[in-house]
């Protein structure tokens, strides 16, 4: 986050996957194996005031880098989403939707003491209360079988072929990121991810002909990001990625996404 104030640029859209603060030494099941839920020191819960202070700080900094008509998407769970919603309102954002991402393949409930966690929430908000935002309503309708797209998205969690691209513990699926990028931006738009990780947001942005800047504190993940970008510069691999995306009802709808749009030019100083 120390880098963000130094960036002299305004963005059309932000996607943020901040710490959920759920690393509590618990256990889960992944690919049939018992695994720790701990993601790293950055995800450790301290106390409610710490979570609020953290979210307030990064949201203030990100807001300064948004165009007046820009929107922001923020993913979370019950561990952090209430704090984020409260602070968005406090900072005069306008909350537009709370998307419920219902995973079609969630991990099973290990403890059997409560309902299986199968959803994440994604808040969509615009920077200003009264400044209109962009929403590609017609495309979302087309991608949903010519029906209005609702705020519950049934999409799979990360697929094995995507997980092989990176070992980041909180990687998001391309299908989710592609949908929200197409919904809220036009081709050539600038997208920022302040918690980029291995830059799946950047991959989705570039596949959809948008421009991207990612920030992360881990050099290892920045190197992975650069390698992933180099990989999709091969048109054959980029097309392969697009065809593997899930969440389209039929081939006609997939073709809408595969339609060639104008290629943007990327600055050499940027990750994407």
Regions found by a protein language model. Name each.
Residues 1-224, 270-272:
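Core catalytic lobe of class I
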């Amino acid at each position: 986050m120390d880098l963000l104030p130094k960036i002299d640029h305004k963005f059309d859209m932000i996607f943020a996957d901040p710490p959920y603060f759920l690393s509590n030494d618990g256990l889960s099941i992944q690919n049939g194996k018992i695994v720790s839920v701990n993601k790293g020191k950055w995800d450790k819960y301290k106390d409610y005031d710490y979570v609020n202070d953290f979210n307030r700080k990064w949201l203030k900094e990100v807001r300064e880098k948004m165009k007046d008509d820009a929107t922001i998407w923020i993913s979370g769970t019950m561990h952090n989403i209430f704090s984020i919603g409260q602070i968005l309102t406090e900072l005069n954002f306008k909350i537009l939707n709370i998307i419920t991402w219902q995973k079609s393949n969630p991990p099973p409930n290990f403890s059997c003491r409560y309902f299986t966690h199968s959803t994440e929430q994604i808040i969509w908000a615009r920077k200003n209360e009264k400044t209109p935002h962009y929403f590609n309503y017609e495309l979302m309708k087309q991608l949903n079988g010519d029906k209005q797209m609702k705020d519950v998205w049934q999409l799979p969690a990360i697929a094995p072929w995507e997980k092989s691209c990176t070992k980041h513990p909180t990687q998001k699926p391309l299908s989710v990121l592609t949908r929200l990028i197409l919904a809220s931006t036009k081709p050539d738009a600038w997208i920022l991810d302040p918690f980029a990780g291995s830059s799946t947001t950047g991959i989705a942005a570039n596949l959809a002909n948008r421009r991207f800047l990612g920030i992360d504190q881990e050099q290892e993940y920045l190197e992975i990001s650069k390698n992933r970008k180099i990989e999709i510069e091969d048109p054959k691999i980029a097309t392969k990625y697009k065809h593997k995306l899930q969440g389209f009802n039929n081939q006609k709808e997939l073709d809408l996404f595969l339609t060639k749009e104008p290629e943007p030019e990327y600055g050499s100083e940027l990750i994407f």
